[in-house]
């Protein structure tokens, strides 16, 4: 019988992305919150993406008893200081006390980019894994102060949306390659296509290794 691992998000684009990190694990079956009918809300009160990923993974494990993978991210603009209220940080969807849907995010961030952009942006991620016993581990390598990370994974956020949309990741429609000025959707390879480098290769390998080692109990 396959081991079931729950993807701890309802974001359809993030589900596909997180599944890709588990693709090399043998004998598993990934399931979603929708598959299980789980609607339990999660209070994201962590101070970092890594802490929020841990909170999510543990909450969904407690609700289901399953092994879980969790993820959270923050969005950061170089144009704003870390204490500037316009700096999204962990609150990408939460603006002025409201939680924005995809259309609301497009409207808000396109206005922000029109007023101050194009904005030099970067996502920073944290990952977490919980097994069936409740054992938990986290991983984060991203840092907005890491010049190699920002130069590798940074992008431009612009004020004019691309015609294409991706449910769950609406800001992809505002995102451009800073080296070519192309929208992500117009690049060969799609979302945030980057030049292959030792840094980017090692980053992906480290995330894969984190999940593989954890679920194989190494």
Predicted feature descriptions by range:
Residues 2-6, 13-218:
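Anionic-ligand binding patches
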């Amino acid at each position: 019988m396959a081991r079931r691992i729950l993807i701890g998000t309802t974001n359809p684009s993030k589900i596909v992305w997180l599944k890709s990190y588990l693709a090399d694990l043998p004998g598993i079956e990934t399931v979603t919150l929708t598959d299980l009918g789980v609607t339990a809300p999660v209070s994201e009160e962590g101070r970092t993406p890594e802490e929020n990923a841990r909170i999510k993974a543990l909450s969904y494990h407690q609700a289901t008893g399953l092994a879980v993978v969790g993820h959270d991210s923050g969005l950061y603009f170089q144009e704003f200081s870390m204490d500037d209220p316009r700096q999204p940080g962990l609150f990408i969807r939460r603006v002025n006390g409201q939680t924005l849907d995809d259309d609301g995010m497009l409207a808000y961030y396109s206005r922000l980019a029109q007023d101050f952009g194009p904005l030099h942006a970067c996502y920073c991620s944290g990952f977490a894994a919980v097994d069936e016993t409740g054992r938990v581990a986290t991983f984060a390598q991203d840092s907005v102060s890491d010049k190699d990370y920002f130069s590798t994974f940074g992008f431009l956020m612009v004020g004019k949306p691309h015609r294409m949309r991706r449910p769950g990741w609406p800001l992809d429609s505002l995102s451009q390659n800073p080296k070519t000025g192309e929208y992500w959707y117009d690049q060969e390879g799609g979302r945030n296509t980057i030049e292959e480098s030792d840094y980017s290769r090692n980053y992906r390998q480290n995330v894969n290794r984190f999940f593989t080692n954890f679920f194989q109990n190494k």
